Amino acid sequence: MTLIGKKLKTNNFFKMIKKLIVFNFIIFLISLNAVHSIEPDIFVQSTVNRASNILSKNISKDDKINELKAIAKETVDIRGVGFYSLGPVRKTLDENQKIKYSELFESYFLKSFSSRLAEYTNPEIEVQGKEVLNKNYTIVNSLLIGTTDRPEVKIDWRIYTKNPENPLIRDLIIEGLSLARTQKEEFSSILNSNDGDINILFKTLEEFSNK
């Protein structure tokens, strides 16, 4: 074999090695992403299990509420839910009003959510399936298991998955009724009854949170 032939063979060998290294690196990155991404159904089951553990603890109601608030702040897109609930009025707010609304809505939401959930004792929710709507949203289907005191309830979770490493809850659909949409209708009613005065809504949220 000539010297040129040996060089060509050597160059081809190193090119093949480089391709293999690049290929393996790409596979590694894909695997790494798969490890860190969280499937929406697993995320929901984990969240409800955490909440159930809190509700079954032998602690005061206030302590349960505080722990449930911490879970909600971590797993719910409170800001997204808040501005959805505000409807088209959100486009008319200045930056200071947006900041104030976000703060008031978070306090309102956390109190409303945690106070209602704290009334349950060890609720058992079973995840039954999921439907990927698009890259940003997945619906997770679940069932609140019935007891002698309450019937079973179908609960669908609208999960925001734009960041697969940090899925967030954007809505609960209970027996076909969207809580986010219901909230939006309530806020719209308050605004329509007060000539669209956002300060009246601010006052309503503040009064609820301070009760």
Regions found by a protein language model. Name each.
Residues L20-S31:
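Bacterial N-terminal signal peptides
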Residues A34-S37:
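Boundary at the C-terminal end of the N-terminal hydrophobic targeting segment
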Residues E39-L117:
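Early exported N-terminus immediately downstream of N-terminal targeting peptides
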Residues K111-V153, T204, F208-K211:
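Surface-exposed, charged secondary-structure patches
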